[in-house]
Amino acid sequence: MKPYDLPDARGHFGPYGGVFVAETLMHALDELRAAYDQCRVDPSFIDEFNYELKHFVGRPSPVYHASRWSQRLGGAQIWFKREDLNHTGAHKVNNCIGQALLARRMGKPRVIAETGAGQHGVATATVAARYGMECVVFMGSEDVRRQASNVYRMKLLGATVVPVDSGSRTLKDALNEAMRDWVTNIENTFYIIGTVAGPDPYPRMVRDFQTVIGQECLTQMPEVIGRQPDYVVAAVGGGSNAMGIFHPYIPYENVRLIGVEAAGEGMETGRHAASLAAGQIGVLHGNRTYVMQNADGQVQETHSVSAGLDYPGVGPEHAWLKDSGRAEYAGITDDEALAAFHDCCRIEGIMPALESAHAIAQAVKMAPALSKDKVILVNLSGRGDKDMHTVAERAGLQL
Protein backbone atom coordinates (compact mmCIF):
# COMPACT_ATOMS: atom_id res chain seq x y z
CA MET A 1 0.00 0.00 0.00
CA LYS A 2 1.25 3.44 -0.98
CA PRO A 3 0.81 6.22 1.60
CA TYR A 4 -1.20 9.24 0.42
CA ASP A 5 -1.28 12.55 2.28
CA LEU A 6 -2.60 15.25 -0.05
CA PRO A 7 -3.40 18.14 0.01
CA ASP A 8 -0.27 19.87 1.31
CA ALA A 9 -0.37 22.55 4.01
CA ARG A 10 -1.45 25.18 1.46
CA GLY A 11 -4.38 23.12 0.18
CA HIS A 12 -2.68 22.00 -3.04
CA PHE A 13 -3.03 18.64 -4.80
CA GLY A 14 0.07 18.95 -6.96
CA PRO A 15 -0.59 22.04 -9.13
CA TYR A 16 -4.34 21.99 -8.34
CA GLY A 17 -6.49 23.39 -5.54
CA GLY A 18 -5.26 26.32 -3.47
CA VAL A 19 -7.09 29.52 -2.55
CA PHE A 20 -8.02 31.98 -5.33
CA VAL A 21 -10.57 34.33 -3.81
CA ALA A 22 -11.19 38.03 -3.17
CA GLU A 23 -9.39 39.52 -0.17
CA THR A 24 -12.80 39.98 1.52
CA LEU A 25 -13.13 36.18 1.88
CA MET A 26 -9.65 35.44 3.24
CA HIS A 27 -10.55 36.08 6.88
CA ALA A 28 -13.62 33.80 6.67
CA LEU A 29 -11.55 31.02 5.08
CA ASP A 30 -8.77 31.37 7.68
CA GLU A 31 -11.39 31.16 10.44
CA LEU A 32 -13.01 28.11 8.81
CA ARG A 33 -9.65 26.37 8.28
CA ALA A 34 -8.67 26.88 11.93
CA ALA A 35 -12.04 25.60 13.19
CA TYR A 36 -12.00 22.57 10.89
CA ASP A 37 -8.41 21.63 11.70
CA GLN A 38 -9.32 21.73 15.38
CA CYS A 39 -12.58 19.76 15.04
CA ARG A 40 -11.25 17.03 12.75
CA VAL A 41 -9.00 15.73 15.54
CA ASP A 42 -11.41 16.46 18.41
CA PRO A 43 -12.85 13.15 19.73
CA SER A 44 -16.09 14.83 20.89
CA PHE A 45 -16.70 16.29 17.40
CA ILE A 46 -15.94 12.94 15.73
CA ASP A 47 -18.26 11.11 18.17
CA GLU A 48 -21.09 13.60 17.53
CA PHE A 49 -20.63 13.30 13.75
CA ASN A 50 -20.67 9.47 13.91
CA TYR A 51 -23.72 9.49 16.22
CA GLU A 52 -25.67 11.65 13.76
CA LEU A 53 -24.64 9.47 10.79
CA LYS A 54 -25.93 6.38 12.59
CA HIS A 55 -29.11 7.67 14.24
CA PHE A 56 -30.23 10.44 11.85
CA VAL A 57 -28.91 9.28 8.45
CA GLY A 58 -29.24 5.52 9.07
CA ARG A 59 -25.63 4.52 8.33
CA PRO A 60 -23.93 2.26 7.49
CA SER A 61 -25.52 1.99 4.04
CA PRO A 62 -25.40 -1.60 2.72
CA VAL A 63 -23.52 -3.05 -0.24
CA TYR A 64 -25.79 -4.98 -2.61
CA HIS A 65 -25.02 -7.59 -5.29
CA ALA A 66 -26.82 -6.74 -8.55
CA SER A 67 -26.93 -10.47 -9.21
CA ARG A 68 -29.65 -10.63 -11.88
CA TRP A 69 -27.99 -7.93 -13.94
CA SER A 70 -24.50 -9.43 -13.46
CA GLN A 71 -25.82 -12.82 -14.61
CA ARG A 72 -27.43 -11.26 -17.67
CA LEU A 73 -24.21 -9.49 -18.66
CA GLY A 74 -22.25 -12.71 -18.21
CA GLY A 75 -19.00 -11.14 -17.00
CA ALA A 76 -17.84 -9.31 -13.87
CA GLN A 77 -20.02 -9.16 -10.76
CA ILE A 78 -21.56 -5.74 -10.14
CA TRP A 79 -22.11 -4.52 -6.58
CA PHE A 80 -23.81 -1.28 -5.48
CA LYS A 81 -22.91 0.85 -2.48
CA ARG A 82 -26.42 1.95 -1.54
CA GLU A 83 -26.11 5.66 -0.72
CA ASP A 84 -29.65 6.01 -2.10
CA LEU A 85 -30.90 4.48 1.17
CA ASN A 86 -29.61 7.35 3.33
CA HIS A 87 -32.08 9.77 4.91
CA THR A 88 -32.80 12.42 2.20
CA GLY A 89 -31.96 9.88 -0.53
CA ALA A 90 -28.32 10.56 -1.42
CA HIS A 91 -24.74 10.87 -0.21
CA LYS A 92 -25.01 14.65 0.19
CA VAL A 93 -26.28 14.50 3.79
CA ASN A 94 -22.98 13.01 5.08
CA ASN A 95 -21.17 16.26 4.30
CA CYS A 96 -24.03 18.54 5.35
CA ILE A 97 -24.12 17.08 8.85
CA GLY A 98 -20.37 17.55 9.23
CA GLN A 99 -20.46 21.18 8.09
CA ALA A 100 -23.59 22.03 10.11
CA LEU A 101 -21.97 20.68 13.28
CA LEU A 102 -18.93 22.81 12.45
CA ALA A 103 -21.13 25.89 11.89
CA ARG A 104 -22.74 25.33 15.28
CA ARG A 105 -19.34 25.15 16.98
CA MET A 106 -18.32 28.38 15.22
CA GLY A 107 -21.48 30.14 16.44
CA LYS A 108 -22.95 30.76 12.97
CA PRO A 109 -26.79 30.60 13.15
CA ARG A 110 -27.38 30.97 9.37
CA VAL A 111 -26.32 28.49 6.68
CA ILE A 112 -26.36 28.96 2.91
CA ALA A 113 -25.82 26.48 0.09
CA GLU A 114 -25.79 26.15 -3.68
CA THR A 115 -27.56 23.24 -5.35
CA GLY A 116 -27.93 21.76 -8.85
CA ALA A 117 -30.05 18.62 -8.70
CA GLY A 118 -31.52 19.89 -5.46
CA GLN A 119 -30.15 16.99 -3.37
CA HIS A 120 -27.54 19.12 -1.62
CA GLY A 121 -30.15 21.83 -1.06
CA VAL A 122 -32.54 19.30 0.48
CA ALA A 123 -29.77 17.84 2.65
CA THR A 124 -28.72 21.33 3.82
CA ALA A 125 -32.33 22.32 4.56
CA THR A 126 -32.77 19.03 6.44
CA VAL A 127 -29.78 19.52 8.74
CA ALA A 128 -30.67 23.20 9.24
CA ALA A 129 -34.10 22.08 10.47
CA ARG A 130 -32.46 19.40 12.62
CA TYR A 131 -30.23 21.98 14.36
CA GLY A 132 -32.62 24.96 14.31
CA MET A 133 -30.68 27.12 11.85
CA GLU A 134 -31.81 29.68 9.28
CA CYS A 135 -31.24 28.30 5.75
CA VAL A 136 -31.01 29.94 2.31
CA VAL A 137 -30.42 27.84 -0.83
CA PHE A 138 -29.31 29.29 -4.19
CA MET A 139 -30.42 27.37 -7.27
CA GLY A 140 -30.16 28.16 -10.99
CA SER A 141 -33.63 28.92 -12.39
CA GLU A 142 -33.16 26.21 -15.05
CA ASP A 143 -32.57 23.69 -12.25
CA VAL A 144 -35.57 25.07 -10.33
CA ARG A 145 -37.63 24.11 -13.39
CA ARG A 146 -36.00 20.65 -13.71
CA GLN A 147 -36.23 19.82 -10.01
CA ALA A 148 -39.58 21.25 -8.90
CA SER A 149 -40.23 18.51 -6.33
CA ASN A 150 -36.90 19.13 -4.57
CA VAL A 151 -37.62 22.88 -4.49
CA TYR A 152 -40.88 22.17 -2.68
CA ARG A 153 -39.11 19.76 -0.29
CA MET A 154 -36.64 22.51 0.67
CA LYS A 155 -39.48 24.94 1.34
CA LEU A 156 -41.30 22.34 3.45
CA LEU A 157 -38.12 22.00 5.52
CA GLY A 158 -38.16 25.75 6.20
CA ALA A 159 -35.50 26.91 3.73
CA THR A 160 -35.70 29.99 1.51
CA VAL A 161 -34.95 29.04 -2.13
CA VAL A 162 -33.44 31.81 -4.27
CA PRO A 163 -33.66 31.19 -8.08
CA VAL A 164 -30.60 32.51 -9.96
CA ASP A 165 -31.29 33.95 -13.43
CA SER A 166 -27.75 34.85 -14.50
CA GLY A 167 -25.51 32.93 -16.94
CA SER A 168 -26.63 29.42 -17.82
CA ARG A 169 -29.01 29.49 -14.81
CA THR A 170 -27.46 26.28 -13.43
CA LEU A 171 -25.06 25.15 -10.69
CA LYS A 172 -22.07 27.41 -11.41
CA ASP A 173 -24.32 30.49 -11.33
CA ALA A 174 -25.90 29.36 -8.05
CA LEU A 175 -22.38 28.95 -6.63
CA ASN A 176 -21.45 32.49 -7.70
CA GLU A 177 -24.52 33.94 -5.96
CA ALA A 178 -23.87 31.93 -2.79
CA MET A 179 -20.30 33.28 -2.68
CA ARG A 180 -21.67 36.86 -2.98
CA ASP A 181 -24.10 36.26 -0.12
CA TRP A 182 -21.30 34.84 2.04
CA VAL A 183 -19.11 37.93 1.51
CA THR A 184 -22.03 40.17 2.51
CA ASN A 185 -23.10 38.20 5.61
CA ILE A 186 -19.80 36.79 6.76
CA GLU A 187 -20.31 37.44 10.50
CA ASN A 188 -23.35 35.20 11.03
CA THR A 189 -23.27 32.90 7.97
CA PHE A 190 -21.64 29.54 7.24
CA TYR A 191 -21.41 28.47 3.59
CA ILE A 192 -22.04 24.71 3.20
CA ILE A 193 -20.42 23.87 -0.16
CA GLY A 194 -21.83 20.64 -1.57
CA THR A 195 -18.89 19.27 -3.50
CA VAL A 196 -15.10 18.78 -3.33
CA ALA A 197 -14.46 22.13 -5.08
CA GLY A 198 -14.03 25.69 -3.88
CA PRO A 199 -11.05 27.21 -2.05
CA ASP A 200 -9.16 25.29 0.66
CA PRO A 201 -10.28 23.90 3.13
CA TYR A 202 -13.48 22.92 1.25
CA PRO A 203 -12.09 20.21 -1.11
CA ARG A 204 -10.45 18.27 1.72
CA MET A 205 -13.18 18.99 4.27
CA VAL A 206 -16.02 17.77 2.03
CA ARG A 207 -13.91 14.74 1.04
CA ASP A 208 -13.20 13.92 4.70
CA PHE A 209 -16.90 14.04 5.60
CA GLN A 210 -17.73 11.81 2.60
CA THR A 211 -14.98 9.19 3.15
CA VAL A 212 -17.37 7.35 5.45
CA ILE A 213 -18.65 5.80 2.17
CA GLY A 214 -15.34 4.19 1.22
CA GLN A 215 -14.39 3.38 4.81
CA GLU A 216 -17.58 1.32 5.17
CA CYS A 217 -16.80 -0.45 1.88
CA LEU A 218 -13.32 -1.41 3.12
CA THR A 219 -15.03 -3.34 5.92
CA GLN A 220 -18.13 -4.52 4.03
CA MET A 221 -16.59 -5.94 0.83
CA PRO A 222 -14.34 -8.51 2.58
CA GLU A 223 -17.42 -9.61 4.56
CA VAL A 224 -19.39 -10.37 1.38
CA ILE A 225 -16.73 -11.38 -1.18
CA GLY A 226 -13.72 -12.12 1.02
CA ARG A 227 -11.58 -9.31 -0.46
CA GLN A 228 -11.65 -5.80 -1.91
CA PRO A 229 -13.23 -5.14 -5.35
CA ASP A 230 -11.15 -4.97 -8.53
CA TYR A 231 -12.80 -1.74 -9.71
CA VAL A 232 -14.53 1.13 -7.93
CA VAL A 233 -16.75 3.23 -10.21
CA ALA A 234 -18.46 6.54 -9.39
CA ALA A 235 -20.05 9.48 -11.21
CA VAL A 236 -18.11 12.76 -11.25
CA GLY A 237 -19.68 16.23 -11.47
CA GLY A 238 -17.89 18.25 -8.83
CA GLY A 239 -16.87 14.85 -7.52
CA SER A 240 -17.82 14.45 -3.84
CA ASN A 241 -19.50 11.04 -4.01
CA ALA A 242 -16.54 9.76 -6.05
CA MET A 243 -13.93 11.19 -3.65
CA GLY A 244 -15.91 9.71 -0.75
CA ILE A 245 -15.57 6.19 -2.12
CA PHE A 246 -12.18 6.64 -3.90
CA HIS A 247 -10.15 8.21 -1.10
CA PRO A 248 -9.96 5.21 1.27
CA TYR A 249 -9.02 3.02 -1.73
CA ILE A 250 -6.18 5.25 -3.05
CA PRO A 251 -3.47 3.30 -1.13
CA TYR A 252 -4.83 -0.03 -2.54
CA GLU A 253 -2.92 -0.02 -5.82
CA ASN A 254 -4.59 -3.18 -7.13
CA VAL A 255 -8.03 -1.50 -6.96
CA ARG A 256 -8.71 0.53 -10.13
CA LEU A 257 -10.62 3.77 -9.62
CA ILE A 258 -12.88 4.90 -12.46
CA GLY A 259 -14.68 8.24 -12.44
CA VAL A 260 -17.53 8.78 -14.88
CA GLU A 261 -18.20 12.20 -16.36
CA ALA A 262 -21.28 13.38 -18.26
CA ALA A 263 -20.61 13.08 -22.01
CA GLY A 264 -24.04 14.68 -22.59
CA GLU A 265 -25.08 14.56 -26.25
CA GLY A 266 -21.64 13.19 -27.20
CA MET A 267 -18.10 14.50 -26.73
CA GLU A 268 -17.88 15.51 -30.40
CA THR A 269 -20.94 17.82 -30.08
CA GLY A 270 -19.41 20.06 -27.42
CA ARG A 271 -22.67 19.67 -25.46
CA HIS A 272 -21.36 17.81 -22.42
CA ALA A 273 -19.90 18.42 -18.94
CA ALA A 274 -16.69 16.36 -19.12
CA SER A 275 -14.14 18.84 -17.79
CA LEU A 276 -11.42 16.24 -17.13
CA ALA A 277 -11.69 14.92 -20.69
CA ALA A 278 -12.13 18.21 -22.53
CA GLY A 279 -11.32 21.07 -20.14
CA GLN A 280 -8.18 23.15 -19.75
CA ILE A 281 -6.46 24.07 -16.53
CA GLY A 282 -7.96 27.24 -15.08
CA VAL A 283 -9.33 28.79 -11.92
CA LEU A 284 -13.00 28.37 -11.02
CA HIS A 285 -14.79 29.01 -7.72
CA GLY A 286 -11.60 29.58 -5.77
CA ASN A 287 -9.41 26.68 -6.89
CA ARG A 288 -7.20 25.66 -9.82
CA THR A 289 -8.53 22.64 -11.70
CA TYR A 290 -9.74 21.48 -15.13
CA VAL A 291 -12.41 23.86 -16.42
CA MET A 292 -14.60 23.84 -19.53
CA GLN A 293 -13.46 26.99 -21.35
CA ASN A 294 -13.87 28.58 -24.76
CA ALA A 295 -11.01 29.96 -26.89
CA ASP A 296 -11.04 33.21 -24.87
CA GLY A 297 -10.72 31.37 -21.56
CA GLN A 298 -14.33 32.11 -20.58
CA VAL A 299 -16.24 29.39 -18.72
CA GLN A 300 -18.20 27.41 -21.26
CA GLU A 301 -21.82 26.36 -20.83
CA THR A 302 -22.16 22.66 -20.12
CA HIS A 303 -24.91 20.15 -20.72
CA SER A 304 -26.07 16.94 -19.04
CA VAL A 305 -29.45 15.28 -18.63
CA SER A 306 -28.39 15.04 -14.99
CA ALA A 307 -28.55 18.37 -13.14
CA GLY A 308 -25.98 17.20 -10.58
CA LEU A 309 -23.29 16.56 -13.21
CA ASP A 310 -23.96 19.79 -15.13
CA TYR A 311 -20.90 21.66 -13.79
CA PRO A 312 -18.02 23.18 -15.83
CA GLY A 313 -15.28 22.34 -13.30
CA VAL A 314 -14.25 19.38 -11.16
CA GLY A 315 -12.74 18.97 -7.70
CA PRO A 316 -8.95 19.61 -7.70
CA GLU A 317 -8.19 16.21 -6.18
CA HIS A 318 -9.79 14.53 -9.21
CA ALA A 319 -7.56 16.66 -11.47
CA TRP A 320 -4.54 15.38 -9.53
CA LEU A 321 -5.74 11.74 -9.56
CA LYS A 322 -6.20 11.97 -13.33
CA ASP A 323 -2.76 13.46 -13.99
CA SER A 324 -1.02 11.04 -11.63
CA GLY A 325 -2.78 8.09 -13.27
CA ARG A 326 -4.16 6.80 -9.95
CA ALA A 327 -7.72 7.20 -11.26
CA GLU A 328 -9.10 6.91 -14.79
CA TYR A 329 -12.03 8.88 -16.15
CA ALA A 330 -14.61 7.85 -18.74
CA GLY A 331 -17.62 9.59 -20.30
CA ILE A 332 -21.22 8.34 -20.48
CA THR A 333 -23.81 10.04 -22.70
CA ASP A 334 -27.33 11.10 -21.74
CA ASP A 335 -28.78 8.20 -23.73
CA GLU A 336 -26.49 5.61 -22.12
CA ALA A 337 -27.35 6.92 -18.64
CA LEU A 338 -31.10 6.87 -19.37
CA ALA A 339 -30.85 3.29 -20.67
CA ALA A 340 -29.04 2.26 -17.46
CA PHE A 341 -31.70 4.05 -15.40
CA HIS A 342 -34.51 2.07 -17.05
CA ASP A 343 -32.62 -1.23 -16.89
CA CYS A 344 -31.78 -0.76 -13.22
CA CYS A 345 -35.47 -0.18 -12.43
CA ARG A 346 -36.61 -3.26 -14.34
CA ILE A 347 -33.82 -5.72 -13.54
CA GLU A 348 -32.92 -4.85 -9.95
CA GLY A 349 -36.00 -2.99 -8.68
CA ILE A 350 -33.85 0.04 -7.82
CA MET A 351 -34.47 3.51 -9.25
CA PRO A 352 -31.10 5.30 -9.31
CA ALA A 353 -30.50 9.03 -9.59
CA LEU A 354 -29.46 10.05 -13.12
CA GLU A 355 -26.03 10.95 -11.71
CA SER A 356 -25.62 7.39 -10.36
CA ALA A 357 -27.01 5.98 -13.63
CA HIS A 358 -23.88 7.33 -15.37
CA ALA A 359 -21.67 5.22 -13.08
CA ILE A 360 -23.93 2.18 -13.48
CA ALA A 361 -23.82 2.55 -17.29
CA GLN A 362 -20.01 2.49 -17.16
CA ALA A 363 -20.02 -0.69 -15.04
CA VAL A 364 -22.50 -2.32 -17.42
CA LYS A 365 -20.19 -1.41 -20.33
CA MET A 366 -17.16 -2.91 -18.59
CA ALA A 367 -18.64 -6.09 -17.11
CA PRO A 368 -19.12 -8.29 -20.23
CA ALA A 369 -15.44 -7.99 -21.20
CA LEU A 370 -14.24 -9.07 -17.74
CA SER A 371 -14.12 -12.55 -16.20
CA LYS A 372 -16.80 -13.69 -13.75
CA ASP A 373 -14.43 -13.58 -10.79
CA LYS A 374 -13.85 -9.82 -11.21
CA VAL A 375 -15.85 -7.44 -9.02
CA ILE A 376 -17.00 -3.90 -9.88
CA LEU A 377 -18.22 -1.79 -6.96
CA VAL A 378 -20.44 1.11 -8.07
CA ASN A 379 -21.29 4.02 -5.82
CA LEU A 380 -25.06 4.29 -6.21
CA SER A 381 -24.93 7.84 -4.91
CA GLY A 382 -28.65 8.66 -4.81
CA ARG A 383 -32.19 7.62 -5.63
CA GLY A 384 -34.08 8.68 -8.72
CA ASP A 385 -37.39 10.06 -7.44
CA LYS A 386 -36.12 13.59 -8.15
CA ASP A 387 -35.54 12.67 -11.82
CA MET A 388 -39.03 11.33 -12.63
CA HIS A 389 -40.02 14.48 -14.54
CA THR A 390 -36.80 14.52 -16.60
CA VAL A 391 -37.05 10.82 -17.48
CA ALA A 392 -40.75 11.10 -18.33
CA GLU A 393 -40.10 14.21 -20.46
CA ARG A 394 -37.40 12.34 -22.41
CA ALA A 395 -39.90 9.54 -23.03
CA GLY A 396 -42.46 12.07 -24.32
CA LEU A 397 -44.71 11.79 -21.26
CA GLN A 398 -46.16 14.61 -19.20
CA LEU A 399 -46.51 13.87 -15.47
Curated annotation (Swiss-Prot):
Its cofactor is pyridoxal 5'-phosphate. Keywords: Amino-acid biosynthesis, Aromatic amino acid biosynthesis, Lyase, Pyridoxal phosphate, Tryptophan biosynthesis. One of its GO terms (cellular component) is cytoplasm. Gene3D superfamilies: 3.40.50.1100. It catalyses: (1S,2R)-1-C-(indol-3-yl)glycerol 3-phosphate + L-serine = D-glyceraldehyde 3-phosphate + L-tryptophan + H2O. Tetramer of two alpha and two beta chains. This is Tryptophan synthase beta chain. It comes from Bordetella parapertussis (strain 12822 / ATCC BAA-587 / NCTC 13253).
